[in-house]
Amino acid sequence: GAVACCGRSAVARGVACSRVPHVTLMRDTGDMKISADFTVMPDDFAKAAAPEYRTDGVPVISFPFYIDEIDPAARYLHWAFTDPDSIPVCGFEWIHWPVANLPIDALMYDFNDSHALQIPPDFSRQLPSMIPETVQGRTSAASKLVGSTNPQVTMRYNGPQPPDKDHDYSLHVWGTAKPLPGLNQGFWLNELFHALRDVDHVTDQGVMFITGKA
């Protein structure tokens, strides 16, 4: 699987969340493990995607991944798929896919699968009809520097298309006991960060990195 980063969450250490500074809750890596069946993003989800897997030239079929060892107190999932390696290229971390308020109970469990939860391929495009209460945020395609106005691109998964060399993409997933308030379809990523800092029920989190080929 992809490289997964895991540690001890405040809850797992027995520290009351209300007594931990908000920024610590957000930044301290939890017990949750995020993984995939690949370390390099497959073509269908990235720069080499076929025309039928693109919208306005952008790969829009989201990749599958697994979430394991989730804190039992977690009831909702939120994530941000971003490209830190875009910073030297364009001056900021490119936002590829923010998601918030995904109810864990809405995900199907396969008791024959060794993984606790699986996010299936093409989940981004299926979400509005499958789980309408879950919201997807704006990608960097919505920025004034890019100017896309198509919501199928600005508020859906955008696959890796590094222009200069291979980039390592970050998928950061958080678990909370309750939904995050104030987030609507098309939220900006900073709004997700503010919401995570402003609540006292962030129970767990995990990160993995996937390489996108140039």
Where do the PLM segments sit?
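Cysteine-centered motifs
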Residues: 5-6, 17
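N-terminus-centered regions that define maturation/targeting leaders and the start
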Residues: 25-214
